[in-house]
């Protein structure tokens, strides 16, 4: 499958402070954030005009699920649009607090752990063909996902009783299973719950919940692009060396704690390989695969960055990727800060900086400031993101959903939508079932809109 439907779901951390002290509980902050949403959507679980879903997840975490996308830059753009949608709610909520005489600063963090040790996720979704052998996909994909933090981790300072250490991944400490049908209780790497949101006879949806939330656009593109490319190679029957891990959960932590990528991890049968070895195998197969697939500039861009990042890890000289990979950008920032102020990695100010990196408010968040200075690479523009806040992807089913929602809102009609259904809540209860996520034009939807 060279054209693939993809989407990203992001849970955001939330807090409200007043002069540095916590002002409201996360529950209360979430209520203020979603008050405007509830006023027009009558629910804290809504679909937006751009085809995305916005809702309040377990534990007071606002969650934004992008609309269906079918190319990488489109997906990165819609992922960033989610940040802007949430930032807009943040500004509105702060104004409500001020109007009520409460005061306080609301923070939304696109990260994966809070100070209490709780974890929340960034989930990737990839449409795969039902006819494929799911167990083979899992077997080949698992070693890739365990080691890919080397190329797309968000970076984190982990405080241990002995010392503070810089880790590649925020999520690695919180994953407890390899493949499972649960997402919250056990936190697997690949979630197998079969909800395709499409024609179940043709497709299933691969739900990857091991990834970090990325701030850097090129890192997000690399994370999703490499996974989609590995899936494409599996579907095409490309042979891979067997890197089945003895204990994926131990391995994911070991990889996260080793920025050299050289520490050996145990494979099934007593063999060993390093994260760098494993990633090199997938990368070299990808380079070969590019010779046989139809040319695609976005795929070529991510394979180029993949190779440069692996070279950088191997040489430990990150100068050629230090604006493109989240954990590299963050580590460089910490090192500069430590050198300037002569402080240890365990200093609370570094922990503050770690958190501030993920603050999504423009003009305040540290990552945004780095990006404005040209210290973080981009693949989108602000104009494209602004358009994606209100406009669905034009090449997928999301277009139908977005146009239906816009028309129903403009006509003042009561409606219900989900990923596959568009329904007018009138006497006739007219419903259109959109089972093909690749289909952006549908006469049935046009007629439903015209009937308003």
Swiss-Prot record:
Record-listed E.C. numbers: 6.3.1.19
Binding-site positions, ATP: 53, 66, 419
InterPro entries according to UniProt: Pup_ligase, Pup_ligase/deamidase
UniProt entry keywords in alphabetical sequence: ATP-binding, Ligase, Magnesium, Metal-binding, Nucleotide-binding, Ubl conjugation pathway
Binding site for Mg(2+): 9, 55, 63
Active-site feature positions: 57
Reactions accelerated catalytically: ATP + [prokaryotic ubiquitin-like protein]-L-glutamate + [protein]-L-lysine = ADP + phosphate + N(6)-([prokaryotic ubiquitin-like protein]-gamma-L-glutamyl)-[protein]-L-lysine
A Pfam match: Pup_ligase
One GO BP: protein pupylation
Pathway assignment: Protein degradation; proteasomal Pup-dependent pathway; Protein modification; protein pupylation
GO molecular function: ATP binding; ligase activity, forming carbon-nitrogen bonds; magnesium ion binding; ubiquitin-like protein transferase activity
Function description: Catalyzes the covalent attachment of the prokaryotic ubiquitin-like protein modifier Pup to the proteasomal substrate proteins, thereby targeting them for proteasomal degradation. This tagging system is termed pupylation. The ligation reaction involves the side-chain carboxylate of the C-terminal glutamate of Pup and the side-chain amino group of a substrate lysine.
Protein family according to the UniProt entry: Belongs to the Pup ligase/Pup deamidase family. Pup-conjugating enzyme subfamily.
Note: The reaction mechanism probably proceeds via the activation of Pup by phosphorylation of its C-terminal glutamate, which is then subject to nucleophilic attack by the substrate lysine, resulting in an isopeptide bond and the release of phosphate as a good leaving group.
Name under which the protein is recorded: Pup--protein ligase
């Amino acid at each position: 499958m060279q054209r693939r439907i993809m989407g990203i779901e992001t849970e955001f951390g939330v807090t409200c402070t007043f002069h540095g002290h916590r002002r409201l509980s996360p529950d209360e902050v979430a209520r203020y954030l979603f008050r405007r949403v509830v006023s027009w959507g009558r629910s804290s679980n809504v679909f937006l005009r751009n085809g995305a879903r916005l809702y309040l997840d377990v534990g007071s975490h606002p969650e934004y699920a992008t609309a269906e996308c079918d190319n990488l830059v489109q997906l990165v753009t819609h992922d960033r649009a989610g940040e802007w949608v949430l930032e807009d709610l943040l500004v509105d909520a702060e104004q409500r607090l001020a109007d009520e005489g409460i005061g306080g600063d609301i923070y939304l963090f696109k990260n994966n752990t809070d100070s209490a040790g709780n974890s929340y996720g960034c989930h990737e979704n990839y449409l795969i063909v039902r006819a494929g052998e799911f167990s083979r996909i899992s077997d080949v994909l698992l070693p890739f996902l365990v080691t890919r933090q080397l190329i797309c981790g968000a970076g984190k300072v982990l405080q241990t009783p002995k010392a503070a250490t810089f880790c590649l991944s925020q999520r690695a400490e919180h994953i407890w299973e390899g493949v499972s049908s649960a997402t919250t209780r056990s936190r697997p790497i690949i979630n197998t719950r079969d909800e395709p949101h499409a024609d179940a006879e043709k497709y299933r949806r691969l739900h990857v919940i091991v990834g970090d939330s990325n701030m850097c656009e090129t890192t997000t593109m690399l994370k999703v692009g490499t996974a989609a490319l590995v899936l494409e190679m599996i579907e095409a029957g490309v042979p891979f060396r067997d890197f089945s891990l003895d204990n994926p959960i131990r391995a994911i932590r070991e990889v996260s704690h080793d920025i050299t990528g050289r520490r050996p991890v145990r494979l099934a049968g007593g063999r060993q390989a390093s994260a760098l070895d494993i990633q090199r195998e997938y990368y070299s197969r990808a380079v070969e695969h590019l010779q046989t697939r139809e040319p695609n500039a976005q795929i070529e861009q991510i394979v180029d960055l993949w190779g440069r990042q692996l070279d950088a890890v191997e040489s430990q000289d990150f100068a050629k990727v230090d604006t493109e990979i989240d954990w590299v950008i963050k580590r460089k920032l910490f090192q500069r800060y430590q050198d300037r102020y002569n402080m240890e990695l365990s200093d609370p100010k570094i922990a503050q900086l770690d958190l501030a990196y993920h603050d999504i408010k423009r003009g305040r968040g540290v990552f945004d400031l780095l990006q404005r200075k040209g210290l973080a690479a981009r693949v989108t523009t602000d104009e494209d993101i602004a358009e994606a806040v209100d406009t669905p992807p034009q090449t997928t089913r999301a277009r139908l959903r977005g146009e239906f929602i816009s028309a129903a809102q403009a006509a003042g009609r009561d409606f219900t939508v989900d990923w596959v259904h568009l329904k007018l809540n009138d006497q006739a209860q007219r419903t259109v079932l959109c089972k093909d996520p690749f289909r952006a034009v549908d006469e049935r939807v046009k007629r439903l809109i015209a009937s308003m």
